[in-house]
């Protein structure tokens, strides 16, 4: 069955830019339909659907050098093709930027994950990819119920982290922090969740904002080359994803995630901008209240809350760009099956 759809596998065929990937459809012995739409895009339709069937986008490779999710996704697809992995949900698997992965780079011209807002952007390789991804989402979510839509966008962090895995929950105008989504997070042993406080330009935000999808950006470990990822540290996530796709009840126990709210965004305003810590500082490094950790022009950058922590710091961003997120731990609860915090 694999040979009738892929020469090697979904991942490695997608990365073989010298050979075309022709759109085609096959059906497994289990009745699962596999539709290869284009390079890096595979739709999987279960043999039977019902009112509870999810319509899930599972994407990776938005940044070309974040390869651990690619390896996991390739294994899931291999096992779906062979019949080893049961399928109960309709899935759209996406390898977003094969050209960047082949070059072992994050992106070629622009950061793809900053191109999903409604602002005008300079034409580029990545802008064309973003436009194509928007079309794919529109087609995949067409004629589906909002409650059935999920989008898990899988990444790896550039730097080390106090939390090996963490999720970013986008801020959208729809209720996109469902109890079932958060239960999946705990089942996957994702160590922390960041609750965004403002709209953004990411792929997962776009799904949440425009399609009311239960969407997350998931950071799974640290950037490494293909074949060099520590996948054993993502075993619970792997198992939880397989249970999610098959709609099986998990056999392993969940683990509570640490919850953070984004307290503020640090935007670079001056040429004279720097942090006081080294480039290898870990995500979620916390500061004491009033502790100065950098400057922007004449203004010191300091922690405004005890234990306020920094995530995604980048001293080299252009003026006007986000240089870091600041987060604080928060207690959460559910209202109408949606996660909220006080």
From Swiss-Prot:
Record flagged with keyword Cell membrane: no
Recite the UniProt keywords alphabetically: Arginine metabolism, Hydrolase, Metal-binding, Zinc
Which reaction is the catalytic activity of this chain?
N-succinyl-L-glutamate + H2O = L-glutamate + succinate
> In the record's cofactor note, how is the cofactor described as bound?
Binds 1 zinc ion per subunit.
Q: Which GO molecular function annotations are given, in alphabetical order?
A: hydrolase activity, acting on ester bonds; succinylglutamate desuccinylase activity; zinc ion binding
Q: In which pathway does it act?
A: Amino-acid degradation; L-arginine degradation via AST pathway; L-glutamate and succinate from L-arginine: step 5/5
| GO biological process: one example | arginine catabolic process to succinate
Q: Where does Zn(2+) bind?
A: 63, 66, 155
- What is the protein's name according to its record? Succinylglutamate desuccinylase
Traced from the root, the source organism's taxonomic lineage reads: Bacteria, Pseudomonadati, Pseudomonadota, Gammaproteobacteria, Vibrionales
